[in-house]
């Protein structure tokens, strides 16, 4: 029996999909701006 693939971890979540990480790259900033334009309440993890 294999284990579940999703093992929740808030620190890992923030480090891989967080706002600071998104702002680091040009593509990441594009993601944030798209989500802002769409009117998302949560921009990043």
Curated annotation (Swiss-Prot):
UniProt entry tagged with the keyword Ribonucleoprotein: yes
Record GO terms (molecular function): structural constituent of ribosome
A family per Pfam: Ribosomal_L34
UniProt cross-references to Gene3D superfamilies, sorted A to Z: 1.10.287.3980
CC per GO annotation: ribonucleoprotein complex; ribosome
Biological processes per GO annotation: translation
InterPro entries to which the protein is assigned, alphabetical: Ribosomal_bL34, Ribosomal_bL34_CS
Alphabetic keyword roster: Ribonucleoprotein, Ribosomal protein
Disulphide-bridged cysteine pairs: none
Family in the record: Belongs to the bacterial ribosomal protein bL34 family.
PANTHER family (UniProt xref): LARGE RIBOSOMAL SUBUNIT PROTEIN BL34M, MITOCHONDRIAL RIBOSOMAL PROTEIN 34 FAMILY MEMBER
Protein known as: Large ribosomal subunit protein bL34
Gene: rpmH
